[in-house]
Structure formats: structure tokens, C-alpha cells
């Protein structure tokens, strides 16, 4: 026996036959799990091979025990859960049940959606959450809110959590396809005033770096036929709240907005949220039934054929079109400049263009930009969108338990005027 095979303890007898069999088993350590028979430890000796194997086994167990930190149950997104191949989910109701119920909220199921029986409301909510990579925070702060037919819209975080726990497969949600009528390659742009807005919008999209490419349906209510009134109401509430949160998140990521002071940001949001919500709804509304006034406004945008990059341009201009603010162009050309943005009008739009493109683009006229801006900034449009927000989001009206801070501050003194 060589020196490296000598036992570590010379005060006891040789290893038993069972120990020898255990030592032979160590040779397969890299192919199978390491198992040590109990008689091995009664022999009073341990070989260096076994010592090394034990150390490796304990190290492997410690690595397996070092799992990721527990989920924050108050903040939920689809990325909070692993893929379906590595997670055990609650068993959804089988299709042989006499009454097909949604596994998430218990409403009547329209069939299997993303792997489980679900209603149109929950399947649509799950699809939007996955496609837009939305992050929700539990309203109650517990992560255990009741999710049923009557309360499914009260806490989006707990609803998404239950969708995933019940077995909805986020990998089954397909990426959105661009509509055929906008998928064609556009010809090269010249400096004609009619084409300048599209060229400018592309530059703004590049500056912002996060153009939202959500699809737009031909008609905002064309896909809502066949839905029950409850489903239409749920879809309306979800879409409105989702678009409001989405456009506010967009503003927080807009680089020219982030350099403003907190008081300036607050004043902009309180003043411009109806217009920003209007643009967002016109851009991203899906199979939702709106009232006649808002539907008419959205159809006007459809006829203008506004592209996603142009919608981003409109949102950027809308932020700075109402009040006199000091707009810092920080970090461009290694210096900071102050540009004063004047109230709404073509002159204000030109100045916003200068603020966005001064670093590397020439300041030019807006051309077709004035038309959609006039729609968004009209007094009628503001009241229409405020009335829509109040009617579709009753829980956010002042006095509600889950009042949205933006709506609570901005609609509190205007509700009597717009209803």
C-alpha cells in the first residue's frame, strides 16, 4: 500500500469488507451521487479518498443550499418565476369538469389559455403582463390578496402571481407581430415638409432609446364583440390603468424629464397626464370598447397613420408644451444649456425640437406634427379623457382605498366639471 493510501488513523484495525466496498463506490463519485454506507464509519479509519469525497459532497450540498433569495411577495413580474420546465404549479381544473371555470378567478372559462383553463379577462391580463414585461406591486403589501371574479382587478400583483402559480406558461405567449399595413419598408425620406415629422420622430426615438412597439388594432372595439358586459368593463379598467402606469414609467425614463427637479416633474405630471394617457390609449389600445367621444378621437389618430416612433415624439413634446420650465440639456456636447419651453403652439413645438435635437441635428419646422398635437391639446380631448378615466377607474377616484396618486391629485378638483 502506498503512502497516499495509508489510513489516517493507525490506532484501529483495517477497514472492514463493507468499508472496502464503500471505497470502491467512491470511484464513481463523478458519475453518480455519493452514498456512504453506515458500516464504513464503524471501522475507525477513513481513507484519503473518502475524505476527499466527503469534502466534495459537503461542498456540493452547500452549493445546492445557496439558492436565490426569497421572492419579494409584494412586487411581482413574470421574471419573478422560473420557466415552466423547472417549476411545480398548482393543478388546474381538468377539462372534464361539468362546469369549466377559470383556474385563476373562478369565472366561466372560455377554454385553455397558456396551459390552463382561464377566462378571457385573466388570459388577456396575463398576455399583456408578459408582452410588456410589467412589474406590479401588491396594493395591500402582503402578496396574499383575494383573487376571484369580484376582486380580480383590485391587485394586479397578486393576480399575476396566481396566474403563474396556477400554471400559466409565460413562454407560450407569442411575440407581437407587426400589422401588415405597416410592415412594408418605407421609401427613403427627403427634406419635404410632409416627411420631416417622420424623420424627426425617428431621431427622437433613437435619442430616447426605448421606442414602444406595441401593436395597434384597426378599430378599438372591433375585437370586443361577443364579450359579456363584465368582461368589457374588466378589460376597460385593465387597459386604462395599464396605459396610465406605462406612460408614467415612460416619462420617468425620458432623459430630458429625469434632469428636472421634483417640483417640476410633479407639475408636469399633474398638468399633462390626461394628454399623455390619451396618446398612450390611441397608440396601444387593444380589444376594448370605449365611449363614442374617445373612440372618435382614436379613429382620427388611426387616419393619421401615426407610427410608434411618432407617438414617442408626441409624448416627448406633450411633456413640455404647457408650462414655462427650465429644461436642462445635461450631458450633451459636454455642457449644459437652459432652453425655455413656451406654452402650446407651433413655436413651442419648434423649441422642443431644438431641445431634443440640438446636439447633432438641425432645427427645422414640424409640418404634420401640428395636426395630432392639436387633437391632443384641445379642451374637449382633455375633458373626454378625464371623464373616461373617472368612469373606468372608480377605485382611483378620491376616497377610494387604492387611489392612484396621480389621479387623486389631478382629478380631485375637476370631477364636478367633467362629469
Swiss-Prot record:
DNA-binding feature ranges: 99-175
Transmembrane segments: none
Composition bias, Basic and acidic residues: 226-236
Zinc finger motifs (NR C4-type), residue ranges: 102-122, 138-158
Gene Ontology annotations of biological process type: axon guidance; locomotory behavior; neuron differentiation; neuron fate specification; positive regulation of transcription by RNA polymerase II; regulation of backward locomotion; regulation of forward locomotion; regulation of transcription by RNA polymerase II
Chief subcellular location: nucleus
SMART domains: ZnF_C4
Chain ranges of the NR LBD domain: 205-419
Domain of life assignment: Eukaryota
Domain characteristics, as noted in the entry: Putative ligand binding domain (NR LBD) may be dispensable for import into nuclei and in the development of neurons that control movement.
Function: Orphan nuclear receptor that binds DNA containing an extended core motif half-site sequence 5'-ANGTCA-3'. Required for locomotion, neuron axon pathfinding, and regulation of expression of some peptide neurotransmitter precursors and of NMDA glutamate receptor genes. Involved in specifying interneuron identity, in concert with paired-like homeodomain unc-42. Plays a role in recognition of the PVPR and PVQL axons by the AVKR and HSNL growth cones.
Protein family (similarity comment): Belongs to the nuclear hormone receptor family.
Record-given protein name: Nuclear hormone receptor family member fax-1
Amino acid at each position: 500500500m502506498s503512502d497516499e493510501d495509508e489510513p489516517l488513523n493507525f490506532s484501529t484495525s483495517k477497514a472492514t469488507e463493507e468499508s472496502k466496498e464503500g471505497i470502491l463506490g467512491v470511484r464513481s463519485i463523478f458519475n453518480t451521487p455519493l452514498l456512504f454506507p453506515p458500516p464504513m464509519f464503524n471501522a475507525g479509519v477513513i481513507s484519503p479518498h473518502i475524505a476527499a469525497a466527503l469534502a466534495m459532497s459537503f461542498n456540493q450540498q452547500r452549493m445546492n443550499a445557496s439558492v436565490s433569495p426569497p421572492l419579494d411577495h409584494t412586487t411581482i413580474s413574470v421574471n419573478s418565476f422560473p420557466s415552466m420546465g423547472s417549476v411545480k404549479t398548482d393543478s388546474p381544473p381538468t377539462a372534464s369538469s361539468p362546469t369549466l371555470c377559470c383556474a385563476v378567478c373562478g369565472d366561466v372559462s372560455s377554454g385553455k389559455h397558456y396551459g390552463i383553463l382561464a377566462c378571457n379577462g385573466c388570459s388577456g391580463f396575463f398576455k399583456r403582463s408578459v408582452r410588456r414585461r410589467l412589474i406590479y406591486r401588491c396594493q395591500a403589501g402582503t402578496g396574499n390578496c383575494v383573487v376571484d371574479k369580484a376582486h380580480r382587478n383590485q391587485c394586479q400583483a397578486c393576480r399575476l402571481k396566481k396566474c403563474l402559480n396556477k400554471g400559466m406558461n409565460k413562454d407560450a405567449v407569442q411575440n407581437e407581430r407587426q400589422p401588415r399595413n405597416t410592415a412594408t419598408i418605407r421609401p427613403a425620406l427627403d427634406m419635404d415638409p410632409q416627411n420631416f415629422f417622420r424623420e424627426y420622430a425617428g431621431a427622437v426615438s433613437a435619442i430616447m432609446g426605448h421606442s414602444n412597439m406595441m401593436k395597434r388594432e384597426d378599430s378599438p372595439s372591433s375585437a370586443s364583440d361577443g364579450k359579456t358586459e363584465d368582461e368589457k368593463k374588466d378589460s376597460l379598467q385593465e387597459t386604462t390603468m395599464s396605459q396610465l402606469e406605462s406612460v408614467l414609467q415612460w416619462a420617468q425614463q425620458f432623459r430630458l424629464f429625469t434632469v428636472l427637479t421634483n417640483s417640476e416633474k410633479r407639475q408636469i405630471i399633474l398638468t399633462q397626464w390626461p394628454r399623455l394617457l390619451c396618446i398612450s390609449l390611441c397608440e396601444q389600445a387593444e380589444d376594448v370598447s370605449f365611449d363614442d367621444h374617445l373612440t372618435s378621437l382614436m379613429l382620427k389618430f388611426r387616419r393619421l397613420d401615426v407610427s410608434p416612433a411618432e407617438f414617442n415624439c408626441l409624448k416627448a413634446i406633450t411633456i413640455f408644451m404647457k408650462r414655462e420650465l427650465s429644461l436642462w440639456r445635461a450631458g450633451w456636447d459636454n455642457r449644459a444649456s437652459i432652453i425655455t419651453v413656451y406654452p402650446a403652439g407651433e413655436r413651442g413645438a419648434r423649441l422642443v425640437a431644438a431641445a431634443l435635437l440640438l446636439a447633432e441635428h438641425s432645427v427645422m419646422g414640424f409640418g404634420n406634427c401640428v395636426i395630432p398635437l392639436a387633437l391632443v391639446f384641445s379642451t374637449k380631448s382633455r375633458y373626454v379623457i378625464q371623464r373616461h378615466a373617472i368612469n373606468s377607474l372608480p377605485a382611483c377616484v378620491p376616497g377610494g382605498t387604492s387611489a392612484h396618486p396621480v389621479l387623486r391629485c389631478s382629478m380631485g378638483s375637476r370631477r364636478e366639471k367633467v362629469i
